[in-house]
């Protein structure tokens, strides 16, 4: 089946050609040159396409065709894509938050670690994605991962990194973080999310406990 983007690109090209040939001052073509069409024009998939393709590999249950190494490479690609603010915001538009957070419960430690890393990247200095993480229930999942004593240290540290990014300058997430820590036996009073010193005290305290594990 033909790629619909290519059909749209062809329409745009024809309209442009006809318009300029008949009247150099003609209005723009009716078919809009969207980012998707630009991606087709440039001969490659859009970042959104790459994000979706990466997540399809990450969540694949076809062990014969997709190895753990394949999944980790896809995770690395996904993490690099969402370093871009627009791509991080697009996680919600592409409905990728739920499958991403599901990987925090994966049986493979490296998958859990990469999932936490990607969450941390996505929410760093980004209130929009911090809000989404809170809305989809990601904070309690990360606290659970960070405080689980039988969890490998490197995975727990990535969970703390994600939490550190999730709560800075975003009070609702900081409040829930403190509540969840208290539930886990790490009593934490209310913390001002805009005070980096206060946030660091909580985060570093958790890191120290992990270091002693």
Swiss-Prot record:
What GO annotations for molecular function exist for this entry?
A: adenyl-nucleotide exchange factor activity
Could you mention a single GO BP entry for this protein?
Answer: regulation of translation
| ARM repeat start-end pairs | 22-63, 85-124, 127-168
Q: Which Pfam families match?
A: Fes1
Q: Among the entry's GO cellular component annotations, what is one?
A: endoplasmic reticulum
Query: Cellular location of this protein?
Result: Cytoplasm
Q: Which UniProt keywords apply?
A: Cytoplasm, Repeat, Translation regulation
Residue stretches spanning the membrane: none
The source's superkingdom equals Eukaryota
UniProt key word Signal: no
* Function summary: Functions as a nucleotide exchange factor (NEF) for Hsp70 chaperones which accelerates the release of ADP. Required for fully efficient Hsp70-mediated folding of proteins.
**Family indicated by similarity:** Belongs to the FES1 family.
* Protein name according to UniProt: Hsp70 nucleotide exchange factor FES1
Task: Give the classification, highest ranks.
Answer: Eukaryota, Fungi, Dikarya, Ascomycota, Pezizomycotina
Q: Which gene encodes it?
A: FES1
């Amino acid at each position: 089946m033909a790629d619909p983007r290519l059909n749209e690109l062809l329409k745009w090209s024809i309209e442009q050609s006809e318009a300029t040939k008949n009247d150099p001052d003609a209005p723009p073509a009716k078919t809009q040159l969207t980012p998707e069409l630009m991606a087709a024009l440039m001969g490659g998939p859009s970042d959104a396409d790459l994000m979706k393709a990466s997540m399809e590999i990450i969540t694949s249950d076809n062990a014969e065709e997709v190895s753990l190494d394949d999944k980790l490479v896809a995770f690395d690609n996904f993490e690099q894509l969402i370093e871009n603010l627009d791509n991080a915001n697009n996680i919600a538009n592409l409905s990728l938050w739920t499958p991403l957070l599901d990987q925090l419960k994966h049986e493979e430690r490296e998958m859990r670690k990469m999932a936490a890393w990607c969450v941390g990247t996505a929410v760093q200095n980004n209130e929009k994605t911090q809000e989404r993480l809170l809305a989809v229930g990601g904070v309690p999942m990360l606290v659970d991962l960070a405080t689980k004593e039988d969890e490998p240290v490197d995975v727990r540290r990535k969970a703390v990194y994600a939490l550190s990014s999730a709560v800075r300058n975003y009070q609702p997430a900081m409040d829930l973080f403190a509540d969840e820590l208290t539930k886990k036996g790490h009593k934490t009073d209310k913390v001002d999310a805009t005070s980096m010193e206060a946030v660091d005290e909580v985060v570093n305290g958790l890191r120290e406990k992990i270091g002693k594990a």
